[in-house]
């Protein structure tokens, strides 16, 4: 397992560290933990996995070492 930092793309601040196999699964874990409603999309952008929601929130998963 690797550790991924979930970054708020609006403020560019790290929110949490999530252990996962890849960035997509880290964002899925983050979504299940913190986002209870709304529509969302997880896609790859510039080599990083990004989660965007209908509320205008954008998060990305970056592998930490």
Which residues fall in each region the model found?
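A short, exposed loop/beta-hairpin motif centered on an aromatic-Gly-Thr core
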Residues: 12-22
